[in-house]
Amino acid sequence: GAADFVSKPIEKDRLINSIQTLIGKSENLKICIIEDDENLRFTVKEILEKQGNIVTEASNGKEALIKLNKEENLPDIILLDLMMPIMNGFEFLSQIKDTKIKSIPILVLTGADLDDNDKSFLKNETEKVIHKTDDTVLSIAEEINNVIKRTG
């Protein structure tokens, strides 16, 4: 579950660097990025694809649900933002409860301040919550790597 919540300032490029650090160790994964920040989504996708991974993307939870429900081969991992228009990350997680998508490990990437209810919900519904404000870049890479090791 998503037991650890850390929040210290970090820039997007450090988050991206941490993802790049980890994905260097992993290739041939199918990864779905659900993120409304187009620049961040594009950059992370580019990094993941350069490492030999197959990346699908969606700009909100509704778009992701439509795409994932059409997929025959589901992704190995989902990177999910929480604060998005149309359908946010919490709504996405609620919508997938009784679907095949529920079995996919989900890493939440968020800059949001979470209250105890949010933390409790995410702990039960996701592998890990990684704050976009997380100061420990290495821990971000390690968490993604840990999920990959456990699942594949």
Go through each PLM region and give its residues.
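Charged docking surfaces used in two-component/phosphorelay signaling
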Residues: 42-50
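C-terminal output helix
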Residues: 10-19, 47, 118-121, 133-148, ...
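Conserved acidic carboxylate
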Residues: 35
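Acidic catalytic/metal-coordinating carboxylates
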Residues: 60-63, 88-94
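Short, glycine/charged-rich "phosphate-handling" switch motifs in NTP-dependent
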Residues: 3, 127
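Acidic, metal-coordinating helix/loop segments flanking the phosphotransfer/catalytic sites
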Residues: 57-77
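Active-site residues of response regulator receiver
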Residues: 81, 110
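Receiver (REC) domain active-site loop signature in two-component systems and cognate sites
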Residues: 84
